[in-house]
Structures are given as C-alpha cells and as structure tokens.
Curated annotation (Swiss-Prot):
GO terms for molecular function: oxidoreductase activity, acting on paired donors, with incorporation or reduction of molecular oxygen. SMART domains: RHOD. HAMAP family: TrhO (MF_00469). It comes from the Bacteria. The gene is trhO. It comes from Escherichia fergusonii (strain ATCC 35469 / DSM 13698 / CCUG 18766 / IAM 14443 / JCM 21226 / LMG 7866 / NBRC 102419 / NCTC 12128 / CDC 0568-73). Catalyzes oxygen-dependent 5-hydroxyuridine (ho5U) modification at position 34 in tRNAs. Residues 146-240 form the Rhodanese domain. InterPro entries: Rhodanese-like_dom, Rhodanese-like_dom_sf, Rhodanese_C, TrhO, TRHO_N. PANTHER family: TRNA URIDINE(34) HYDROXYLASE, UPF0176 PROTEIN YCEA. NCBIfam families: PRK00142.1-1 (NF001133). This is tRNA uridine(34) hydroxylase. One of its GO terms (biological process) is tRNA modification. The active site is at 200 (cysteine persulfide intermediate).
Length: 350
C-alpha cells in the first residue's frame, strides 16, 4: 500500500521544487457537496494527485472540498479530466487559475480531513448552506459597483483587505471567518433594504456567507462567482475596467497577486507605501506583517529589534527561549492593530 502522507522534510521538498524546470500552474477550487466518507475520499484523491505530481493544500469534510494546488503544466489537462470524472459532483467544476503565477506556490501535498472545509463556527442545525445568494459575473459586478443601492462586503480577513479590495467595499474587521459571520449580520442590520454583495478570494467564503445572511433574514443578497480571482480574469478577458484596487492576498508562497498597480497599504515598521507580506524570520515568532525592502534589510527580515536579536542567537539558545515562552506569544497574530507592541514595534499612525 502506498504511503499516503509526505515523509520528506520541508527544506528538501522546497529545494527539489525550486530545481524543477517544468512550469507549474497554480489552481484553486472548491465545491460544497455531500461526501459520505471523507477519509476514504481523501486517500483516493491523495493517490490521484500524487501520481500527477500535484503539490498544495486540500481540505475535505462531509460538506465538500477546498483546494489550493500547483500542477505541472504538462499534467493540467489530465488533472482536470481525472478530477471531473472522480465524482459526478465535480464534473465541469470551475477551476480558478492564478492571475500572477510563478509556479512556485507550493512544494508539498498536504491533504486533511476536517470538520468543515472553511471554519465558520455555525452551530445552528436549521442553517441551509445550499440556500446561497445570487451569483454575479464580471460585468454585473461593475454594474453593482455603480449602483448606489448596493453595498459590497469584503468577507476576507483584515490583512487581506488591507492590501487590496473593491472600490468602497466595507471591511468586516476580524482575523477569522468565524468571527466575521456574526459581525456581518450585526453590521448590516441597518442596511437590510440594500443590495448586499459579498466577495472573497475564490468564492468559498462569500458563498457560505451569502447563505448565512439569507438565513438571518436578508433577502437581497449576491456574491461574486469565483471571487476576486475569477472576476479579475473575466474582466480582463472581456476588456472591462478592473475595479479591484491593489493586491489580492493568496494563501501560498506568493502571498499575493497584483491586480492593479495601486499600493494602498503601508510598511508596518516605517509607514512607507508597501503591500508585500512576509513572515518574521524569527522561528519563535513568524508573525505575518507588511515590510518594505529598507526595513527588511534593517531588521534582517524580522518584525522587531527583539526578534532580530533573537534570530541571531545560536540555534540552541533560540530553542531554549522558545521552550520557555508562553503559548500566547506564539499566536500567529495577523492584525496590524495588534502588532506585538511588547516586541518593540511601535503603534503606527497612518
């Protein structure tokens, strides 16, 4: 029986991927449909994906599948055929092809069974995730943006919204989707008569969010088909104005796709215009934050002087410090407003 989990170190896998000569295509897709046995489905897909040298991150649950993957260019057609024939529910599934892709988004295949394919915190047994809002395509999105009766709601996290969003879109300030859902209902109560347009990166979050809004009494609810990725692709193909401003954050090694040339965010350390996310190089931190090239050199890729100093210590001393640190200090904290001021990052006023 083949091994159904990776057993090679991350460093070795990344080096192997970077040495590849064949171009790769970054693809994302999702589908809400009933999977009776997620573990068996997971194992079968793992074998299929491994045979095609697919890398990436795949989640399965009884409610469906959510995947962000990298496929060798020569295998894309075969991958599509095998995925479509794997289950009738996946036939002709929309595949979101990355917009700004160097083919180096993933270097290992990780496939996990979870309670939900996107953590939503919903416990209401009467909630019907299939009762979603109306889909909007690119031209319709642009028309809605010009409709004074429409409100665009960004269902992504704070750090995603910070580097790019649709014109005049409302942010639901939170670091997780499960935090956003109740906040969205609360914030939109005074706008129940408006047209609510929800969007996210690839469609999976805004689709479920649209169903949640309808479950909570909102009647005029839309969401963008395929999310930002599909909107930008179709708008460009059809010669339409692209009304998304800035960069689309993505959850892989690239950390972003350039949609427009606008830079709407700022370096979290010095305040200069910048929209490049990075993870703090200190292994005891790994905070996700925005850092300009000047600060990257000044702080050696770290988020603070404290982390810069710590990352320069001998490995044994770094491990000792990490072992003695409270778990609270290890939280992957993503909001700029909580940028570990105790670690030497001053609060930034922009």
């Amino acid at each position: 029986m083949p091994v159904l989990h990776n057993r090679i170190s991350n460093d070795a896998l990344k080096a192997k991927m970077l040495a590849e000569n064949e171009p790769r295509t970054t693809i994302s897709f999702y589908k809400y449909f009933t999977i009776a046995d997620p573990q068996t489905t997971r194992d079968a897909l793992y074998k299929l994906f491994t045979a095609l040298n697919v890398f990436g991150r795949v989640y399965l649950a009884h409610e469906g599948i959510n995947a962000q993957i990298s496929v060798p260019e020569s295998h894309v057609d075969k991958f599509r055929q095998q995925l479509y024939s794997f289950d009738p529910a996946l036939n002709n599934l929309r595949l979101n092809i990355a917009l700004d892709d160097d083919g180096k988004s993933f270097w290992v295949l990780r496939m996990k069974v979870r309670e939900r394919i996107v953590a939503d915190g919903i416990t209401d047994p009467d909630f019907d995730a299939s009762n979603v809002g109306n889909y909007l395509q690119a031209a319709q999105v642009n028309a809605m943006l010009d409709d004074p009766d429409a409100l665009f709601i960004d269902m992504r996290n704070h750090y995603e919204y910070e580097v790019g969003h649709f014109e005049n879109a409302m942010e639901i300030p939170a670091d997780t989707f499960r935090e956003q859902l109740p906040k969205a209902v609360e914030m939109m109560q005074e706008h129940k008569d408006k047209k609510i347009v929800m969007y996210c990166t690839g469609g999976i979050r805004c689709e479920k969010a649209s169903a949640w809004m309808k479950h909570n009494g909102f009647e005029k609810v839309w969401h963008i088909e395929g999310g930002i990725i599909e909107y930008a692709r179709k708008a460009r193909e059809q010669g339409l104005p692209v009304r998304f401003i800035g960069k689309n954050f993505v959850f892989d090694e690239r950390m972003g796709e350039r949609i427009s040339e606008d830079v709407i965010a700022h370096c979290h350390q010095c305040g200069t215009p910048c929209d490049s996310h990075t993870n703090c190089k200190n292994d005891g931190c790994h905070l996700l934050f925005i850092q300009c090239p000047v600060c990257a050199e000044k702080f050696n890729g770290c988020c603070s002087e404290l982390c810069c100093t710590e990352s320069a210590l001998p490995p044994e001393e770094q491990r000792r410090l990490r072992a003695g640190r409270e778990n609270g200090n290890k939280i992957f904290n993503k909001s700029r407003g909580r940028l570990n001021t105790q670690q030497g990052i001053p609060e930034l006023k922009i």
